[in-house]
Amino acid sequence: MHELGITQNIVAIVLEQARGASVKRVTLEIGKLSAIMPEAIRFCFDICCQDTLLEGVTLEIIETEGKGKCRHCGHEIRLSQPFGQCDRCDSFELDIIQGQELQIKEMEVEELCV
């Protein structure tokens, strides 16, 4: 389960960027072609956040659709797996242009007024 290592890195990045501030919500963007299971990330996130400043933080996951672009005719198609066939010219030569991403999209941080 490579999601544990990925989640440990996500937690480390969020803690570093928060600089001690109270984080309320973390939003991740995970592509459907990334071979990363969102539910496994969610499970690992809860475990990795235990006994840290992130314990109890809300995790939101946005899954992005897979898209490919045909190398022959330039047509864009939806992909549910990292390969496919152009529905315009029947070519199998596609470049994946969306759906492999994993990024921390947003962090909601509570600012303290002093």
From Swiss-Prot:
Which HAMAP family does the UniProt entry name for this protein?
Answer: HypA_HybF (MF_00213)
The similarity comment for this entry is: Belongs to the HypA/HybF family.
Q: Name one GO molecular function term.
A: nickel cation binding
Name of the encoding gene: hypA
Gene3D superfamilies linked: 3.30.2320.80
Any coiled-coil regions, as ranges? none
This protein's record includes keyword Metal-binding: yes
Question: One Pfam match, by short name?
Answer: HypA
Query: What processes does the entry annotate via GO biological process terms?
Result: protein maturation; protein modification process
State what protein this is by name.
Hydrogenase maturation factor HypA
Q: Which organism is it from?
A: Crocosphaera subtropica (strain ATCC 51142 / BH68) (Cyanothece sp. (strain ATCC 51142))
Q: Which UniProt keywords apply?
A: Metal-binding, Nickel, Zinc
Residues noted as binding Zn(2+) in the record, renumbered to the chain: C70, C73, C86, C89
Which residues are involved in binding Ni(2+)?
H2
- The residues forming the signal peptide are none
Q: Which InterPro entries match?
A: HypA/HybF
> Which top-level group of life is the source organism from?
Bacteria
The function of this protein is: Involved in the maturation of [NiFe] hydrogenases. Required for nickel insertion into the metal center of the hydrogenase.
